From Swiss-Prot:
Protein name stated in the entry: UPF0145 protein YbjQ
Pfam family membership, one: YbjQ_1
Family indicated by similarity: Belongs to the UPF0145 family.
Gene (UniProt): ybjQ
Amino acid sequence: MQFSTTPTLEGLTIVEYCGVVTGEAILGANIFRDFFAGIRDIVGGRSGAYEKELRKAREIAFEELGSQARALGADAVVGIDIDYETVGQNGSMLMVSVSGTAVKTRR
């Protein structure tokens, strides 16, 4: 499965548009990580805990996106948009959503 934020794939021709596909992941953030991440932010450091959670959420969302595309018989997803949001009380959860168009391609 190929993923692209562009509307085309170099070297491939889109032969069929299969439909819009989406993937979402919502992960809760641990209160202690939140506290220490806040301290790191104050002193200008990076928050490894948040970065790890963000990567994990993005991977889950892309797995879901690919699964939906495969179910439609597609071999690629183009025009992908990635959105990040904090949700829940006081932004206690992280949501990553991805969407794109599932397509069938040929060389």
